[in-house]
Regions:
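A generic fold-level signal
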Residues: 3, 40, 121-124
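Exposed, low-complexity/repetitive linear segments and helix-based recognition motifs
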Residues: 35, 94, 153-156
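Extracellular/periplasmic head regions of type IV pilus-like filament subunits
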Residues: 53-133
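Membrane-proximal N-terminal amphipathic helix
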Residues: 34-61, 81
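Generic N-terminal leader/processing signal
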Residues: 1-2, 33, 39, 140
Length: 166
């Protein structure tokens, strides 16, 4: 006469299958979270570009970099990313990287003087705005506009980068 119920081996097989399925689900959820954070970063960059153009239209210049560390770049790690855009109401709040890995963050802005890195001095000041590390993409990100001068290619330093002359 056979006892009703599951054997130990049957239970172990079921537990192993559940473990495998749950690890696959968790891995795909983690990737989805990374893609969502990258989408937020790219959206922030689009907002930032629009705010920079509004600032330029109002003041006939792009805002200065704060040069407060991070290699002189104005960066998103300290919560004061491009303060003039917020203080002049071109952005509702400071944009910050969704995952701050260090005091610099992944978002960066710098305004360069005319003629820097071999760019034509007649074009005037210019800014570079970029994302250093997208979680789901290598360098460069497929839709990165890119930015370079004869003496420097910022796309080599960022996953996504853009810029504009004043």
């Amino acid at each position: 006469m056979r006892n009703k119920g599951f054997t130990l081996i049957e239970l172990l097989v079921v537990i192993a299958i559940i473990g495998i399925i749950s690890s696959v689900v968790l891995a795909s959820l983690n990737y989805a979270r990374k893609k969502a954070r990258d989408a937020e970063r790219l959206s922030d960059m689009r907002q930032m570009q629009i705010a920079l153009e509004f600032y330029h239209d109002s003041f006939d210049a792009y805002p200065d970099s704060d040069n407060a560390g991070c290699g002189g770049w104005d960066s998103s790690g300290n919560g004061t990313f491009i303060t003039p855009l917020v203080s002049n109401n071109f952005l509702p709040k400071h944009l910050q990287d969704p995952v701050v890995n260090d005091s610099c963050g992944n978002l960066a802005y710098y305004r360069y003087p005319p003629g820097y890195a071999g760019c034509s001095a007649s074009n005037g000041y210019f800014y570079v705005l970029g994302i250093r590390d997208l979680e789901t993409s290598g360098n460069p990100y497929r839709s990165s506009p890119g930015w370079n001068c004869p003496g420097r290619n910022w796309q080599d330093e960022f996953d996504w980068v853009t810029g504009s002359f004043q």
